[in-house]
Regions:
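Active-site/acyl-donor-binding loops of N-acyltransferases
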Residues: 4-6, 20-22, 43-44, 60-62, ...
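Aromatic (often tryptophan-rich) hydrophobic motifs at membrane interfaces
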Residues: 86-93, 208-317, 321-322
Length: 332
């Protein structure tokens, strides 16, 4: 069944009492994120099939072919025996779209009907593939008091927070219409950081759309300053019971102020004060060398490491799927 009711969609995903994981659901399955994808020119289809909720993004391939991608989903809200069979049938035949070459999912749930989700997916005909989203993340339980959260951090991180306070670093969180006035500040700092570290970015419009998120899935821009000088910035997303640390950057030459560390600490405190239960650092990697510094930075704040099952493909058209993967290997 394709869903078209925003309140019902977010309500079922957020409020349903069956919570299979402390990191589910992800904002990538929110109604607002689907609408953001539409603004970027992609078609979105939202399914509720036997209690499996999936906001699926239609991705274009060559020769008029497509595939569907379900980031951090489907969200499991029931465990009926035939759920996965019915789920696949929904993508295989529908009046609103042509049959895709394959379906790619990245569920966060670890189990289904008491069995490891990996076993369930393999039995249903899915095959493992390279993850799109980071498989691992760090999550801080905000129900703990601030002192307990602070004590779980590395000594150098606690020192950096105290040093930033003594040196006069301030952090402001902007929401609603106020985000428009500071987005360019965030963008300059963010791009300076990515150029400095030779990191890839999406087009500017993507970050602008993220910054405009409002409602049940909303965003805030945080700016850290020394006096009137902005020296670090970040975008956070808020959905369900979690706050997500999504994008961040800092200016060169201001290292002694420890602004990125202090900004993140203030964001943790802000999320706790606002009533969120979890703070999600949004991705770490022990294998990717390019992620080593950011992973070490995030891990210095403590938190529990949680790993998801990764990405899985179900293939509807094997010849085209083979050509697609062969082309990806050749192109790199």
């Amino acid at each position: 069944m394709i869903m078209r009711d925003k309140k019902f969609w977010n309500g079922e995903i957020i409020s349903h009492p069956f919570m299979v994981s402390s990191i589910e659901p992800s904002f990538l399955q929110s109604w607002q994120w689907g609408e953001l994808q539409k603004k970027l020119g992609r078609r979105i289809f939202r399914f509720n099939v036997s209690g499996l909720f999936a906001s699926a993004i239609e991705q274009k391939l060559s020769f008029g072919q497509t595939y569907f991608y379900v980031p951090h989903g489907p969200v499991i809200r029931a465990e009926t025996p035939d759920a996965w069979i019915n789920f696949l049938k929904a993508f295989e035949s529908h009046d609103d779209f042509k049959k895709p070459v394959f379906l790619r999912i990245e569920p966060l749930s670890r189990e289904f009907r008491g069995k490891p989700i990996e076993n369930v997916l393999s039995e249903a005909g899915f095959r493992r593939t390279k993850p799109v989203q980071p498989k691992a993340t760090l999550v801080i339980d905000l129900r703990k008091d601030e002192k307990e959260i602070l004590d779980a951090m590395e000594h150098d991180t606690r020192y950096s927070i105290r040093a930033a306070e003594k040196r006069g670093v301030t952090v402001e969180f902007l929401s609603g219409e106020y985000k428009k006035g500071v987005f360019d500040i965030f963008w300059r700092i963010f791009m300076e950081t990515n150029l400095r570290h030779e990191l890839k970015t999406y087009p500017k419009i993507y970050y602008e759309e993220v910054a405009t998120l409002e409602g049940e899935c909303s965003s805030k821009i945080a700016i850290a300053k020394i006096g009137d000088e902005a020296i670090s910035a970040a975008i956070f997303i808020y959905f369900g019971e979690r706050t997500f640390y999504l994008f961040a950057g800092s200016r060169a030459g201001y290292g002694k102020f420890n602004a990125p560390t202090y900004l993140l600490w203030r964001a943790i405190c802000e999320a706790k004060k606002t009533g969120y239960r979890y703070f999600d650092f949004w991705g770490i990697s022990h294998e990717n060398k390019n992620w080593s510094k950011i992973t070490a930075f995030k891990k210095s704040f403590g938190g529990k490491e949680i790993t998801s099952p990764g990405a899985w493909d179900y293939v509807f058209n094997k010849p085209v799927y083979f050509i697609y993967n062969l082309a990806k290997r050749i192109i790199g």
